[in-house]
Amino acid sequence: GWLAGISYKIPEYYFRTSLTYRSAIKHEMTTTESIEVGVVTPNVMEVKTPQSVNFDFMTGLPYQNILYGTLRWVNWQDFVIQPPKFKAVIDYVAIFYPEATDVKLIQYNKDQWSAKLGLAQVKKKKWLSTMELLWDSGINNPASTLNPSDGYQGIGLGSMYTYNTQFDIAAGLYYLH
């Protein structure tokens, strides 16, 4: 895969923006699957992670405030994980139950969009406090172990104290719904 981006900044306004593209990445891996019915399949599996686009911005506001945000798109629409022996079992079951043909171990049918908008305030050059609003479209799959959420809205609060140039202490809290 590859990554490309463009960035622009105006230091005197503390303005910075960037647009980044990450290509899909094809992975080929060896798999070890156990099955008792004697189905013989290749031990190599291919997974293609999706392409994505990120847009980020940050700008200074009066009274040592900073407005920042991100917008992200991920092309999950055609993402599938289907190990070879799992596919062989599904193909066999589909002989008797044709509706099983489309069953995949993991399959996402919708692209994902997410956004964040935040406001940060610098206090006495040592403290930074933030508040963020978050949104994620999800990918239209039910939540599971492999897909821990299907979209959310949320709010986040954070704070950071800069002790010196080599040591910071930070804490944050998000509420997602």
Task: Please place each PLM-identified region on the residue numbering.
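Outer-membrane beta-barrel porins/channels
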Residues: G1-H177
